[in-house]
From Swiss-Prot:
Keyword Lipid biosynthesis (UniProt): no
Protein name: Proline--tRNA ligase
Gene3D superfamilies attached to this UniProt entry: Anticodon-binding domain (3.40.50.800), Bira Bifunctional Protein, Domain 2 (3.30.930.10)
Main location: cytoplasm
Name of encoding gene: proS
Assembly and binders: Homodimer.
An annotated GO cellular component: cytosol
InterPro entries from the UniProt entry: aa-tRNA-synt_IIb, aa-tRNA-synth_II, aa-tRNA-synth_II/BPL/LPL, Anticodon-bd, Anticodon-bd_dom_sf, Pro-tRNA-ligase_IIa, Pro-tRNA-synth_IIa_bac-type, Pro-tRNA_synthetase
Length: 440
């Protein structure tokens, strides 16, 4: 992508409405624009990051055996009345009526709808276990939306819903998602700590929030410091192994970790003083096991091996991609801008032409741009006629992991400079060596 043809409306000044680093940098880098209170457009740079976040989420959901579907954003109020949540949910839910004056709602979550899909299609235990997920825009009318897309009214969620015959089987499905979430956040460059959490309006018997530690976090959290160094489940994790997944769950829940809502001061004080960690955190995922809370009132049941009908045991598992993007920025930035993990960076490499219009610089940059693009790299080519300082500031602000800088003096010697955005390390090398480093 040539920067001269890319839509990336950079802001030179810090926006006054931004309270936290991620909101400020997302606005300055031209990733998002606010359309109304708590509602944002995702501009091309931001959407590239969001798409890569979603790709990792999908990959890990598929690996764990979940199956993707798509459900509508508008839902019938009848389903929510059936579950008993229509009146209980409160003013966060946007209620509307269609032209026939039928009550509808803009879904804040999808337990009722997916249960309706299940009960109309699945009748036998032989079709279990089943885990269905989707990634969708949702709306909750927050009283005080703030921090950009960290806490907005319209937001994107990955929701998965598991269906099992027994509690034991449902707990295995829960453990699958538990391990999948650990892997997902690790691939996104985040260290997420699972903490026992309140079930809130979703309800249920078991719940964990996945929290990343950050000074700007809204929640106060308390945990054992060893969580920071725990090994995440590997790529070859067997998601069919009951014992293996239970061992992962047991390890990651063996030490004290709780949000402020579930905090037990006495239990925390039992942790050796040098091992206690009190901090602020950002919730990036939430999983629930709620048994038959929805299946019983909505009649979601299957015939078991005993020939009798059984209400299915359910779980739900949420990750907010539009919340994850600012969370990643909160965890990885410096005074100059964003430092993206390679897995979600909008571009892999930015090629900076220090003197656009200079034939040697132009030819060198075109050569590098073409070679890296052909090799499958996402490359941003800064071919603008901006001053060198502006180009460097832009590259640092948007956080592309690698900068390849071509200036007249270096190019005259057949060389370019390669800069690592995270470490700031610079290395001069031949043009061929620079290409080969990222093509090989």
């Amino acid at each position: 992508m040539r920067l001269s043809r890319f839509f990336m409306p950079i802001l030179k000044e810090n926006p006054k409405e931004a309270e936290i680093v991620s909101h400020r940098l997302m606005l300055r880098a031209g990733m998002i624009r606010q359309q109304s209170q708590g509602i944002y457009s995702w501009l091309p740079l931001g959407k590239r990051v969001l798409d890569k976040v979603n790709a990792i989420i999908r990959d890990e959901q598929n690996r764990a055996g979940a199956i993707e579907l798509s459900m509508p954003t508008l839902q019938s109020a009848e389903l929510w009345q059936e579950s008993g949540r229509y009146d209980a949910y409160g003013k966060e839910m946007l209620r509307i009526k269609d032209r026939q004056d039928r009550p509808m709602l803009y879904g804040p979550t999808n337990e009722e709808m997916v249960t309706d899909i299940f009960r109309s299609s699945v009748k036998s235990y032989k079709d279990l276990p089943l885990n269905l997920y989707h990634i969708q825009l949702k709306f909750r009318d927050e009283i005080r939306p703030r921090f950009g897309t960290m806490r907005s009214r319209e937001f994107m969620m990955k929701d998965a819903y598991s269906f099992d015959l027994t509690r034991e089987a449902a707990e295995h499905s829960y453990n699958k998602m538990f391990a999948a979430y650990l892997r997902t956040f690790d691939r996104l460059g985040l260290r997420a700590i699972p903490m026992r959490a309140d079930t809130g309006p979703i309800g249920g018997k078991l719940s964990h929030e996945f929290i990343i530690l950050a000074d700007t976090g809204e929640s106060e959290v308390f945990c054992h410091k060893d969580f920071v160094d725990f090994d995440v489940p590997g790529e070859h994790t067997d998601f069919d192994s009951v014992e293996g997944l239970q061992a992962i769950f047991d390890k990651w829940t063996s030490l004290y970790a709780a949000t402020s809502e579930m905090h037990d001061e006495a239990a925390f004080n039992a942790v050796p003083e040098g091992d206690r960690l009190s901090a602020r955190g950002i919730e990036v995922g939430h999983i629930f096991y709620f048994g038959t809370k929805y299946s019983e009132p909505m009649g979601a049941k299957v015939q078991g091996p005993d020939g009798k009908e059984h209400f299915v045991h359910m779980g739900s598992y949420g990750i907010g991609p539009t919340r994850l993007v600012p969370a990643i920025i909160e965890a990885s930035h410096d005074d100059n801008g964003i430092i993206w993990p390679a897995s979600v960076a909008p571009f892999d490499i930015v090629v900076i032409n220090m003197k656009a219009g200079d034939q040697a610089c132009d030819d060198t940059c075109e050569l590098i741009y073409a070679a890296l693009s052909k090799a499958g790299k996402d490359v941003l080519y800064d071919d603008t006629d901006d001053r060198a300082g502006t180009k460097f500031a832009t590259a640092d602000l948007i956080g592309v992991p690698v900068q390849i800088i071509a200036g007249p003096r270096a190019v005259a010697n057949g060389e370019v400079e390669v800069k690592d955005r995270k470490t700031g390390a610079r290395e001069t090398m031949t043009i061929e060596a620079a290409i080969n480093r990222f093509v090989a």
